[in-house]
């Protein structure tokens, strides 16, 4: 182990997803080798993220305003809502250029072993959003685009149970074709676009 601030930096970097001890050490020593202005810029960006980035009050996506740019865009179809687990999944769907509706970010997936139940996700907000007729528009279709893994499928099944009795609402699930056990963010644009286009009705 190293001493003082160097080890503190390695420890903090190691808490980031996908960063193991060796990667954390490599990044730390890279940061030690760069010029002070570069460190200042990185510090400033982290400060802006801490102070200026929040979550959209409508969909839960990351935003620097109360409403994200997608929810604020009148060209987006408010009657079509795509439900995803995390903000990174919004970006994955956006890269396909196949979806012109809006989103609802759950903030995760059901995982009882990790203590994540329906109360820890933004499911109640989704139900309220459907019932409140956002901007005077009825939500006509909810596309469930949770990850194709055990937690994502459990979340999709739960959502179908919660949504299936709402009058006039169509509930669909993105089509198979995505690798089981994978994450939406790693799917290529063509595969994910086809999964959206081939979505199937759940009720």
UniProtKB/Swiss-Prot annotation:
SMART domains associated with the record: HhH1, TOPRIM
Domain Toprim: 79-179
UniProt KW keywords: DNA damage, DNA recombination, DNA repair, Metal-binding, Zinc, Zinc-finger
Pfam families assigned to the protein according to its UniProt record, in alphabetical order: RecR_C, RecR_HhH, RecR_ZnF, Toprim_4
Highest taxon, organism lineage: Bacteria
InterPro entries for this protein: DNA_Rcmb_RecR, Hlx-hairpin-Hlx_DNA-bd_motif, Rcmb_RecR, Rcmb_RecR_Znf, TOPRIM_dom, TOPRIM_RecR
Functional summary from the UniProt entry: May play a role in DNA repair. It seems to be involved in an RecBC-independent recombinational process of DNA repair. It may act with RecF and RecO.
Protein name per the record: Recombination protein RecR
Upper classification of the organism: Bacteria, Bacillati, Actinomycetota, Actinomycetes, Mycobacteriales
